[in-house]
């Protein structure tokens, strides 16, 4: 119709600056809008991950995005990026709905990664971070004494396998011969 409805779509902004040579390299992805250009830089869309990792190359990967609106906003949840990563083989994807306070998202990421390193599953690690910093960023913000919160609370969503964990890497046994007592 005359008044099209427009909505945002999650993208990942790359630090790579666009150029004519790089445009040729990304040619087909640019034509199909799997890669787009914003302010002279490339961005990848969910379609990029669906295409580039369609054979499961992200197997056993845990993805944690601490960016704003990675999973959309309250009235327009958008799981396209998470679903593309899961379709590419990622075991689990964690991201935020709504705009998130940077210090809250960084604290949540730090806590989650530390508890993954301690052997917890992604579900357990995210739950620990939420118990420590709050289930959303407004809980954290008001606990810090904040007086002017933003409009909508940002909260994490976990998609995929909540029991996924970091692989346990076994140290190889020391092959050096043990010296026997004489």
Whereabouts are the PLM-identified features?
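Short loop/turn segments at strand-loop or loop-helix junctions that form parts
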Residues: 1
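Catalytic cores of nucleophile-dependent amide-cleaving enzymes
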Residues: 5-107
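Active-site-proximal C-terminal subdomain of hydrolase catalytic domains
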Residues: 61-181
């Amino acid at each position: 119709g005359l008044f099209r409805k427009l909505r945002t779509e999650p993208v990942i902004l790359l630090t790579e600056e666009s150029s004519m040579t790089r445009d040729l390299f990304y040619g087909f992805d640019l034509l199909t809008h799997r890669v787009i250009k914003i302010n002279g830089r490339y961005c990848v869309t969910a379609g990029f991950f669906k295409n580039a990792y369609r054979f499961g190359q992200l197997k056993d990967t845990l993805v944690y995005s601490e960016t704003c609106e990675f999973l959309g906003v309250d009235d327009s949840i958008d799981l396209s990026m998470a679903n593309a990563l899961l379709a590419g083989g990622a075991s689990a994807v964690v991201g935020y709905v709504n705009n998130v306070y940077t210090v809250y998202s960084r604290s949540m990421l730090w806590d989650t990664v530390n508890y993954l390193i301690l052997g917890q599953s992604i579900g357990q690690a995210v739950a620990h971070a939420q118990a420590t910093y709050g289930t959303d960023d407004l809980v954290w913000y008001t606990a810090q004494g904040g007086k002017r919160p933003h409009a909508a609370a940002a909260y994490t969503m976990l998609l995929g396998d909540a029991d996924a964990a970091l692989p346990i890497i076994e140290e190889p046994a020391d092959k050096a011969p043990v010296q026997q007592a004489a």
